[in-house]
Amino acid sequence: MSQRKNHRGQQKKAAASPSKSAASSQLQTLSEMFPAWEADELAALLSEHHDDVEIVIDLIVNNKVSKWEPIKKEPKPKKREEVITDSNATQTSHAHNDAKPKHSRERPKNEKRRERKPVQRKEPSAAVQAAQAASPAPAAAASTSSTSSASVPSNSWAAALSKDAKPKQKKEEPEVKEPAQEQEQPKEEQEPAVAAATAAAASAASAPQETQAAPAAPAAPVAPTTTTTNDHAEKPATTWASAIKPKAKPIKKKAPEHVPEEEVSEVVVVETEVSDVVLPQQVAEVGVSFGSLALETEDVPESQPEAQPKPEAQPESQPEPEVQPEAEPEIQQEPVQQEQVQPQQVQQQVQSQPEQPQQPVPVQTQEQPQQPQQPQQPQQPQQPQAQQPQQPQQPQQPQQPQQQPQQQGQQPPHFEKPAQGYDYYPQFQQTQQYQQAAGSVPGQYAYPSFDYSAAYGQLGQAGLGSVASPGYYPAAVNGAAKPAAPAPASAEIGQSPLVQPNNMGQQSMQSGQAQVPGAAPFGYPNYYNYFYNTPFYGNGGMAASTTSYGAQQQPQSQQAAGENAPASGEPETNGVPAQAQANNQYYAQYYGQPNQFGSRGGYPYSGYPASQPYPQSAGQEQPEGAQPSAPQGAPVPGVPSYPQQMPQYGAYQQFPQYGSYQDSNQYRGWY
């Protein structure tokens, strides 16, 4: 901001008029430091940053400013030189077309941005002529650079008309064939040349000088180009760009830098055959059809001879396939050799395998992949050998599958026993019985007014088989299904459908599996509880028994009891934080207690992380169900230890029934 204040303040004025000499010195330094930048751009940057060279350097070095910014770039000397040379060159250079590579005129395709400028720069031509008289050397240098980039701006319709109005199209037509060839080469040459020339000649005025001087000294030493940049700003006051520029620009240090480049590339380009090929193309781009027809007609014969050598190239390419078949037999021979080597290996393997029939099968299997490869190879007499060792190995491979079924036989008690079917009834009933035995359900949930165990969970024990049946509790069915699938073996080892485990065993199991808080109560999909069990529906969507109060929290309460009792298979840390979360979250949802995160708890999906730990903790506990003894780690941060079933997230939590409604925190999202 200090820059802006200064900018609005005195420094801008100082930079504007009194400091042009200072600005010019700064421009010199900048242009020397950044030869790729045109003086116009650097001047614009300086003026913008009130002639603070350090700021400009910082901007450029850190790429905070790019050359191609639209306004600053139009005054780019590259394109100015090209533009001016086009306006002047179209007038002067038709006589000098031979001295200039006309492919340089093709460049305007790339530089259509400059179409305006040739008109503007026809003015400086007078100034340019004066400048040429004043500085013939820079003009000569500019001529070299301009030849590479001179005629670009002929894109402008005015330039196109002025060029085409002249009857030099005929000259161009014979020349077209040459430049097409030249254009390809010199474009390559020109691009470096143009870059060097533009860097060296940082002002557009140099271009008109170049154009007129070009006939005189097309190959003149390049070094003076740097002086042309200075001359341009001072000499043609007619160009708007020159008026903008700070005038004192003795930037002559560039010359030694760019001279070798320009001499190499530009001199070559300048002295290449000259043709006005560009004009018709430019005209065609502009939409004027003068030279474009001639170009097309003449380019066609050029392209044809180009196309003709291609068939010549084809016969050349044809002998190559002949060579390839030669290479192919070599390749084939090589595999044969490999095969010869391999059969030996195979024989060795065959010998070693019967000798060592009891090697661990994986070792032999490693050998096998080689052998099947060998039968693929053409030498067939050796295939049987390769196959024979495979056969002895095969009887050994079945050993692995045998071992695997043994292992599986060990594992299925883990996985298959649950899969064989939990006794959903005894589990569910026992869990609820355990809750009753704990007598903790209402107290645990801190809702003394409502005894969930009596209302819901105990129906099954009351003898309503339907309630206790998995069919009655979709939660029970789903939960039972879940423990079968994800249930880790260790949790389920003690739980065979045949032998009903003691409550502790089932508690650990269910806490690990069906009770995954994420798997709402027995694996309800979470959305049941989210959508239908919200306090608005009063548990409504599901049967009351299946609500989180009934199905879900009953098992949780049993977990709570079991976890309170150290006898439960899982240490408290496993079940407690998850249950605490689940219960807290369910209560937050049902009684609208705000979540840890202040999201409105009473509404479905209200809390971002807090209400969705069901799935999270589900992911957590199921693996932990696999390792019931492994503590879950520090209790979930927001969730108090289990007996505080009412988490005290904030002071308001202590009156949960008011939470979602009176809590200002709940409504932050609403205003």
Curated annotation (Swiss-Prot):
A GO CC annotation recorded here is: nucleus
Q: Quote the biased-composition stretches of kind Basic and acidic residues, using this chain's numbering.
A: 66-83, 95-124, 163-190
Post-translation changes = Ubiquitinated. Proteolytically cleaved by the proteasome in response to transcription stress; the resulting N-terminal form constitutes the activated nuclear form and the C-terminal portion is degraded.
Tell me the keywords, alphabetical order: Chromosome, Cytoplasm, DNA damage, DNA repair, DNA-binding, Nucleus, Telomere, Ubl conjugation, Ubl conjugation pathway
Protein's GO biological process: DNA repair
Sequence ranges of Polar residues compositional bias: 85-94
Q: Does the keyword Iron-sulfur apply?
A: no
Note the InterPro entries from the entry. Answer: CUE
Taxonomic superkingdom: Eukaryota
Q: Compositional bias (Basic residues) spans? A: 1-11
Per UniProt, residues of the CUE domain are 22-65
Give residue spans, biased composition: Low complexity: 12-26, 125-160, 192-229, 302-322, 332-413, 422-436, 480-491, 502-513, 551-561, 602-617
**Entry annotated with the keyword Manganese:** no
GO molecular function list: DNA binding; ubiquitin binding
Q: Where in the cell is it found?
A: Cytoplasm; Nucleus; Chromosome, Telomere
Q: Where is this region: Disordered?
A: 1-27, 66-266, 294-439, 480-516, 546-577, 601-651
Signal peptide extent: none
Report the protein's function. Answer: Recruits the ubiquitination machinery to RNA polymerase II for polyubiquitination, removal and degradation, when the transcription-coupled repair (TCR) factor RAD26 fails to efficiently displace stalled RNA polymerase II. Also involved in telomere length regulation. Binds DNA.
Its family remark reads: Belongs to the DEF1 family.
* Subunit relationships: Homodimer; may form higher order oligomers. Interacts with the large RNA polymerase II subunit RPO21; the interaction is direct and serves to bridge RPO21 to the Elongin complex in a manner dependent on transcription stress. Interacts with RAD26.
Q: What is this protein called?
A: RNA polymerase II degradation factor 1
